[in-house]
C-alpha cells in the first residue's frame, strides 16, 4: 500500500538483478530510497553481499550518473560492533561504497523495522510473554530498538524536505 496523492508516487516493479531496467527508473528521479535488506541468506542469489553490498553500490553509481538530489539508504543498527558477522560486514561494505560513489547520501541505521501486520512483532511479543528468560547476544551489548515503519517514513520525509546533509544516522 502506498501513501501519497496521485502523481507523487510512481510504483514500478523491477528485479534487483536487472541493472538495465533499474537504470530506467533513474532518468526522471530526484531521490533514491533503498529499503531492501535480508536477515538471512538463501542458497540462490539473495546473499548478504548481493543485497547489502552490490545492489546499493549500483544504486549509488546510478544516483551519480543521473545527478539525483539525494540517496537515502536504510542499513542496520550495531553493525560496527558485530565484526564477526557476514551480515554486518556486508552492510558496512555497502555503506562505504555508497558514500564513496555518491557523497550526497544519508545512511539510516535503524534496528528492526516492524508494522502492525507483520509476523515479526507478533512472534517476538509472543516469545517475550512466554519465555521465563530472554537470551542477550554479544554479552547483552546488542542494540535492539524496534522502530515502526510509520516512524521510519517520517524520518525519511524529514530528511528529504529539510535537505539534511550527508550523514550516518
Label for each model-derived stretch:
Residues 5-65, 77-81:
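NAD(P)H-binding glycine-rich loop region in Rossmannoid oxidoreductase-like domains
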Residues 125-138:
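A short C-terminal helix-loop "cap" of Rossmann-like NAD(P)-dependent dehydrogenase/epimerase domains
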Residues 119-120, 139-161, 167:
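Substrate-positioning beta->alpha
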Residues 10, 104-106, 167:
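Conserved beta-strand segments of alpha/beta enzyme cores
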Residues 1:
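N-terminal Rossmann NAD(P)H-binding glycine-rich loop of SDR-like oxidoreductase domains
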Residues 17, 79, 113-115, 152:
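Conserved sequence/active-site signature of Rossmann-fold short-chain dehydrogenase/reductase
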Residues 85, 106-125, 141-143:
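Flexible, glycine-rich beta-alpha linker
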Residues 50-101, 105-111:
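Conserved Rossmann-fold NAD(P)-dependent oxidoreductase catalytic core, especially the SDR/UDP-sugar
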